[in-house]
Design a protein with these regions (language model features):
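Assembly/oligomerization scaffold segments
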Residues: 1-125
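Amphipathic, non-transmembrane alpha-helical segments in extracytoplasmic/periplasmic proteins
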Residues: 63-66, 120, 132-158, 171-194, ...
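Solvent-exposed, acidic/flexible segments
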Residues: 78-80, 97, 135-143, 169-177, ...
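Conserved "cap/hinge" positions at secondary-structure junctions
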Residues: 89-91, 202, 316, 322
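Short, compositionally biased
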Residues: 101-110, 204-207, 331-342
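An acidic/polar, Gly/Ser/Thr-rich interaction patch typically located in mid-to-C-terminal regions
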Residues: 49-80, 221-380
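Compositionally biased, intrinsically disordered low-complexity segments enriched in polar/Pro/Gly
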Residues: 1-21, 215-224, 364-380
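Short beta-strand-centered interaction patches in the first periplasmic/extracellular domains
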Residues: 2-9, 115-124, 161-224, 230
Length: 380
């Protein structure tokens, strides 16, 4: 992108700020392109900016949508390969969320009307994490494997990793990122790379967090929540071969009910977990427990849209209150924050329930007391 003293940096604190306001919040965005502030330069062309934060499986993403009536974004301002974008997004009430540098990954042109969309991702594809590897890890732990791969990728490990002994696990000609993604899923963790950090976090540790916000129905613009009545496995059968005793071993693992005291989901489904060669019983049990927990936390899930709050990000817990049987603590799987010209500042969250928290029953009054109690009061 050839611009004198321009490289995409501080964005949107002008035109969108003046048009996209709310009763309690005034949105603000700052973008840097190759560490240079170009807010005032691109302000006349800016249609929207969005940031999507994923819990796992995908790189975080920034999209900048620009008018291109005169063709400058297709020609002299056309971005160059490897350019970096950084972003700050937020408002005057909740504060700003500062993101790290992201690498430009895609440029889209559509017409009519003539619009250019820039997409940037939080991680670039480097030679080290493209390499396919085949090897076995023996007599180690999950944490040790993660740290070993992080050193190979020159990344710093962050997050809480549960102590899970690993007798043997094999990397089957997989890229390191693919292998870590599989390990995380199999052993109840989430994984992604953010900048120079390798985030590997136990799912139960995420679920145990205190809610960062308590949301009532009136706090949400629209929502969709669903509860799977059937199809949620309640049990896992673990089978494997005991080489020493030369017998087949089989154990059963049960999940905890999402709503304690309530009727368990109607399901005859049972997960079947088969031990791989060299796996210990503790190792395969950990895989079974992770599979059950993942299935259970997928039972109640959904998404909702609310007035923008960039401080709500993937991996946090929010509590929904006043939603009846849907009330409870929810883990944020994905958060998308968007400021759009004429459309204001919105946050869209994808969530799953990690703990049911019943609503407090209304306090009894004289008008709502049971008839028996009312009669007793009359005779006293």
């Amino acid at each position: 992108m050839q611009m004198p003293n321009l490289h995409l940096g501080a964005l949107l604190s002008g035109s969108l700020n003046s048009t996209a306001s709310h009763l309690v919040t005034l949105p603000k965005v700052i973008i840097k392109y190759e560490q240079k502030d170009i807010t005032s330069d691109i302000q006349p062309y800016l249609l929207s900016v969005s940031y999507t934060d994923y819990l796992e499986g995908q790189s975080d993403e920034v999209q900048v949508e620009l008018e291109d009536v005169d063709g400058r974004w297709r020609q002299k301002w056309y971005p160059e390969q490897g350019d970096k974008i950084s972003l700050e997004i937020g408002d005057q009430i909740n504060g700003m969320l500062k993101l790290g540098s992201m690498e430009l990954a895609e440029i889209e042109y559509q017409h009519p009307p003539s619009v250019i969309t820039l997409k940037a991702l939080s991680t670039g594809i480097t030679k080290s994490n493209r390499t396919q590897r085949g090897r076995a890890y023996e007599h180690t732990t999950l944490a040790d494997i993660v740290r070993r791969i992080a050193r190979r990728l020159h990344l710093k490990v962050t997050g809480t990793i549960r102590h899970i002994p690993i007798e043997r696990v094999t990397q089957y000609q997989e890229r390191d990122v693919e292998f870590l993604t599989r390990l995380a899923k199999e052993y109840g963790h989430t994984f992604k790379i953010v900048g120079r950090q390798l985030v590997f976090q136990a799912n139960d540790a995420l679920a145990e967090q205190k809610p960062v916000a308590v949301l009532l129905p009136e706090d949400i613009k629209n929502f969709r929540l669903r509860d799977l009545i059937k199809g949620v496995p309640q049990e896992a059968v673990v089978s494997g071969y005991d080489a020493k005793r030369k017998t087949t071993r089989r154990t059963r693992r049960r999940s905890k009910a999402l709503r304690p005291g309530g009727k368990r989901a109607s399901s005859g489904d049972t997960l079947k977990i088969v031990a791989n060669r060299g796996e210990s019983q503790a190792q395969v049990n950990a895989r079974a427990d992770a599979a059950l927990a993942n299935a259970q936390q997928s039972q109640v899930a959904g998404n909702f849209s609310m007035v923008g709050n960039a401080k709500l990000v993937a991996g946090q817990v929010v509590q929904l209150k006043g939603f009846g049987k849907f009330s409870g603590k929810y883990l944020v799987k994905q958060a998308r924050h968007e400021i759009r010209r004429g459309g204001g500042f919105t946050s869209d969250l994808e969530v799953k329930m990690v703990e049911y928290v019943p609503d407090e029953p209304p306090q009894a009054t004289a008008a709502t007391q049971p008839k028996k109690q009312a009669a007793k009061n009359a005779n006293s």
